[in-house]
């Protein structure tokens, strides 16, 4: 075990990360030198606007199922890998729909009153 919370566990000496968090207006500065980008706001044009500063970018992961709003010509023509969260919501969404169908079929709204 580690002596204190700041000690690195044994065998992980080679793992280091420079984590940067920013809003859309700070992406141009934050993406400079970054190798990966995790994108939450998939409707934002921030990646397109900051593209010239993305000098080492290798991977963009978008936390949505679609990537249509992210894609632009320069990104398509680059070697940057784009991944998404396709399939992550399949099971929870199916479970919700099934529950809603059962609740409707059993007239649950009146049953709870």
Walk through the language-model features, giving the residues of each:
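An N-terminal-biased, well-structured beta-alpha scaffold segment characteristic
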Residues: 1-81
């Amino acid at each position: 075990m580690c002596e204190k919370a700041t000690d690195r566990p044994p065998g992980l000496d080679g793992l280091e990360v420079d984590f940067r968090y920013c809003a859309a207006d700070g992406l141009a500065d934050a993406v400079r030198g970054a190798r990966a980008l995790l994108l939450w706001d998939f409707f934002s044009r921030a990646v397109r606007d900051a593209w010239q500063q993305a000098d080492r970018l290798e991977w963009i992961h978008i936390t949505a199922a679609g990537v249509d709003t992210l894609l632009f010509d320069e990104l398509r023509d680059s070697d940057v890998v784009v991944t998404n969260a396709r399939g992550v919501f399949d099971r929870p969404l199916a479970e919700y729909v099934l529950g809603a169908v059962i609740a409707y079929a059993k007239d649950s709204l009146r049953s709870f009153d």
